[in-house]
UniProtKB/Swiss-Prot annotation:
Belongs to the UreD family. It comes from the Bacteria. Coiled coil: none annotated. It is found in: Cytoplasm. This is Urease accessory protein UreD. Pfam families: UreD.
Amino acid sequence: MIKTSWEGNCFLNFFNNKASIGNVDKTIFKSKSTSPYKLLKSTHDEEGRCILPVLHTAGGLVGGDLLQFEVNLEKNSKVLLTTSSAQKVYGSVGRSKINPKGSFSKQKNYIKILDNSHLEYLPQETIIFANGLYDQKFKVFISENSSFLFTDLIRLGRSSSGESIESGVFRSKLEIIRNNDLYDDWEYVDQIELSKASYEAKSGMDYMPVFGSLIWVCEKDFSKLKINNLVGNIKKFFKESDNHLSIGILENGISVRFLGSSSQEARKCFFCIWKQIRSVCGFCEPKYQGVWPLQDSMNY
């Protein structure tokens, strides 16, 4: 039987290279991947942080596709992972007489962050085309003195073409587990399902097609005062925005939600929050990445 779906794998192992840039240690990596994954050229910022864009060469996902993405940060690593384009999930429902209900395309993500390491995973948005079915799972293990920043931006349908999600479904589960010497402690769990019903519900998305999450889990001993000041600054920024934004304080970090009509506005909001997080951590100011949409760069 001829297979018509992708089964792609990507493994990335980042580690600190003592051969430094001046007086700054540089994070480098080893990788192993299969199609449709392709790694673009990595660069480094002034803190030695490895900046790596990942490309999905197939141009999108269809029902039955299975991707596995595994990331490991060794001790004393700093990494910014992103993607070079939006992830497109094409329609599956009603496309096949054999399986008229369609089948989900799936992505499983496994991330491990060891001592004194910091991962920023900022992929571009996922676009669920009409009748697209997508299920993503993230399992993140993080040490007590490390941090993890993650953004997830979802667009339901191509609203510029008058398209909605129709019978499509987006599912996501994020689990963040804190490692210590004695036991593993659940840090954060987030489970989301978006469909036409939630898109149309007044108490849901209320016909606004763009939904975003920003999750930042910091070191266990990070200053609570700094987190409170960060939240205060972000709330001031919210007052200047016409979008629906909310923020919650986690035990160690923050959770931000975005709801609106513009992916560009969502990216702008998350970029501004990212700058605030970098500042409160004492890291260098982030820069707009060249693989991100050109029109956005004029606004930052």
